[in-house]
A protein has these predicted regions:
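Structural signal for alpha-helical transmembrane segments and their membrane-water exit/capping regions
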Residues: 1-10, 175-179
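Hydrophobic alpha-helical segments of secondary membrane carriers
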Residues: 31, 156-160
Length: 280
C-alpha cells in the first residue's frame, strides 16, 4: 500500500500506476505471474522427483530436464516466426496455457517405475506450453503500451513473473511437505499393522527418513518403497495444485485483446516524437 501511494505521488515513479489502466498490461502481468508459478512448479518439483524417487544425482536430474528446455526454446522460436509472418499473437498464450494445464495433469501419473522416456515426453509438453506463452505475452505487452513506457512495462512483467515463481515455489513446497507428512504417517501406519517387527527396526524421524532415501540398502525394501510411494503421492498433490493455476492462466489468455502489431515505421515515428519532446 505504501509503495502504491508513493508511486502515485512520485514525479518519476519506478512503476507508474497508470499502466494498470491498460487492459493488456494488467492481463499480461497476471499471466506472467501464473506462468512463473507454473514454470518453477515444474522446474523445482521434477528434479526433486528425479533425485528422491528415481535416485538420480543432482547433476543427472538437471541434465534430464533438457527436454523441458528444448520444448521452451523450440516453441518460442516457432511462435515468434508465426507472429512475425501473420501478425497474430493471441492464440499462442491460449494454446500454451492449455497445453501447460494438460501436461501438468499428466505429471500426476508419475510413479516409482515411470521410465525416463515417458517423463521426457511430459517435460517437452510442459516446455512447449511455456514456450508458446512466455515470450508471446511480452510481445502483446510491448505492442500495447506507449513507446516511452516499453522499458518499464517489460521490466514490470519480468518482476511479476518472478513474483509468481516465488509464491508458486512457496505454495508448492508447503503442499509437498504437508502431504508428505500425511502419506508417510499413513504408509508407515499400514506397514506397522502388517509387519510390526519391521517398523521396530527403523527410524521414522525426518533425519531417519532422509537417511533411508539416501541409503536404500540400510532399511528393508518394503520400508524404502513405502517412503518412495509417500513422496510420489505428495508430488501428485503438488501437480494437482498447480493445474488450476495454469487453467486460470488459460482463462486470462482468452480475455487478452489482439491489437494490430506495430511496424518498424511506427517505432521510428514514436522515437522521433519522443526525441522532439525531449528537445522541446
Amino acid at each position: 500500500v505504501v509503495f502504491v501511494i508513493w508511486e502515485e505521488k512520485a514525479e518519476e515513479p519506478i512503476l507508474p500506476m497508470r499502466l494498470f489502466k491498460n487492459h493488456t498490461f494488467t492481463l499480461t502481468s497476471l499471466l506472467g505471474a501464473v506462468i512463473g508459478a507454473g514454470l518453477f512448479g515444474a522446474v523445482i518439483m521434477l528434479p526433486l522427483y528425479l533425485q528422491i524417487v528415481k535416485s538420480n544425482s543432482a547433476t543427472a536430474a538437471g541434465l534430464k530436464l533438457i527436454p523441458l528446455m528444448l520444448g521452451i526454446v523450440s516453441m518460442s522460436i516457432f511462435s515468434g516466426k508465426q507472429i512475425t509472418t501473420h501478425g497474430k499473437y493471441k492464440k499462442f498464450p491460449i494454446i500454451g496455457t492449455a497445453i501447460m494445464t494438460v501436461a501438468i495433469l499428466m505429471l500426476t501419473t508419475l510413479t516409482r517405475s515411470t521410465p525416463y522416456w515417458q517423463l521426457s515426453i511430459y517435460a517437452i509438453i510442459v516446455g512447449a506450453g511455456l514456450g508458446l506463452s512466455m515470450q508471446t505475452i511480452v510481445i502483446a505487452l510491448q505492442n500495447a503500451v506507449d513507446y516511452h513506457d516499453m522499458g518499464v512495462a517489460t521490466s514490470a512483467n519480468t518482476f511479476f513473473r518472478s513474483l509468481g515463481s516465488v509464491f508458486g515455489s512457496a505454495i508448492f513446497g508447503a503442499v509437498l511437505n504437508n502431504r508428505l507428512a500425511h502419506y508417510m504417517a499413513s504408509g508407515f501406519s499400514n506397514l506397522a499393522h502388517k509387519d510390526p517387527s519391521v517398523m521396530s527396526t527403523i527410524n521414522i524421524t525426518p533425519a531417519g527418513i532422509t537417511n533411508m532415501i539416501a541409503n536404500p540398502k540400510s532399511v528393508p525394501l518394503v520400508v524404502h518403497n513405502t517412503a518412495l510411494d509417500a513422496y510420489t503421492n505428495a508430488f501428485h498433490i503438488v501437480f494437482f495444485t498447480a493445474a488450476p493455476i495454469t487453467a486460470f492462466g488459460f482463462v486470462l489468455a482468452l480475455m487478452l485483446r489482439e491489437l494490430p502489431l506495430r511496424t518498424s515505421h511506427d517505432y521510428a515515428v514514436a522515437r522521433e516524437e519522443a526525441a522532439g519532446e525531449a528537445i522541446g
